[in-house]
Amino acid sequence: MKFQVVLSALLACSSAVVASPIENLFKYRAVKASHSKNINSTLPAWNGSNSSNVTYANGTNSTTNTTTAESSQLQIIVTGGQVPITNSSLTHTNYTRLFNSSSALNITELYNVARVVNETIQDKSSAGAVVVANAKSLEAVSFFFSIIFDTEKPIVVTEDSAYAIPVANNKNATKRGVLSVTSDKLVYSGVFTPPTACSYGAGLPVAIVDDQDEVKWFFDASKPTLISSDSIIRKEYSNFTTPYGLLENGVPIVPIVYDGGYSSSLIDSLSSAVQGLVVVSSGSTNSTSSTIESTEIPVVYAQANTPLNFIDNKDVPKNAVGAGYLSPIKAQILLSIAAVNGVTSKSALESIFP
């Protein structure tokens, strides 16, 4: 009964997703506009229970410009988190506020922010982008951008712009894919940004920012296998690397549910309303005793509350997919991107999950 109540709430959010006012940013090319707008967003949170106030302006009100026309510009795009009161000491930077959210960004918002970042890095004067997000969104934004963007320009996601700017400005930040900087100044590949539930210092950092704001790299530049140039995602699913898929194919509903004794018939009954499920494995090992699976919708199993764990396809029910080393949030993001692009077969999903 509890599960049915939760599912009813999840299905209700499918009718709550509406077009974002950020679309006006592209319609009117507001990045280069000389005026500004304040718009109340109707974007729902992932559970459809609340919305954010969106303010965007690229003229005089909410964009701070310390660049010169001749210099490359580092774009700081704010969706939450911490930014300095003034950035007058920083040259060649633009600050643009899209959201001021303290909630985890949903898939609609992630795609909307990606469209802004894409517009930014396509500009020849752009040296790269820093995206400031709240702590709840850091993992999702970092991983989402890692899949969406295939560029040599640095894109750095952070809770605090002061930590990320030295990284984005560092010449060795290129050719690494999207990076994230946590509040303890550790730098991660976006693919391996630690889950929010894990303690600081977890995961696989690639660098650290010292007290003098110098970046100390641990490894030579390279991209994780998941998103490398010869990966399945890059070679066979290049359509993943577009921030516009959501506009063409609609918003996917991919809930995260916890392991339990739910019948396959109940799961299959959701196939008309959800595009997939991520099941959080309750086992202390990589395997699961759960029987949740479906022939109608993709079901992906992931492990929670550990920096890194691996769930293989042989560890899950026959008609399900193992998320490999991806956390539930990362699995939800990848499954959502796949759904947006029509990639739903078990064999295809097995090829893109690690």
UniProtKB/Swiss-Prot annotation:
GO cellular component: extracellular region
Induction: In response to nutrient limitation. Repressed by high glucose concentrations.
Annotated InterPro entries: Asp/glu_Ase-like_sf, Asparaginase/glutaminase-like
Domain Asparaginase/glutaminase: 50-354
Description of post-translational modifications: Extensively N-glycosylated.
Keywords: Glycoprotein, Secreted, Signal
GO biological process: cell wall assembly
Cell compartments where the protein resides: Secreted
Ranges in a coiled coil: none
Signal sequence residues: 1-19
Membrane-spanning parts: none
Residues annotated as glycosylated: N40, N50, N53, N58, N61, N65, N87, N94, N100, N106, N118, N172, N239, N286
Propeptide residue span(s): 20-37
UniProt record similarity statement: To yeast sporulation-specific protein SPS100.
UniProt function note: May be involved in cellular adaptations prior to stationary phase.
Name of the protein in question: Protein YGP1
Organism of this sequence: Saccharomyces cerevisiae (strain ATCC 204508 / S288c) (Baker's yeast)
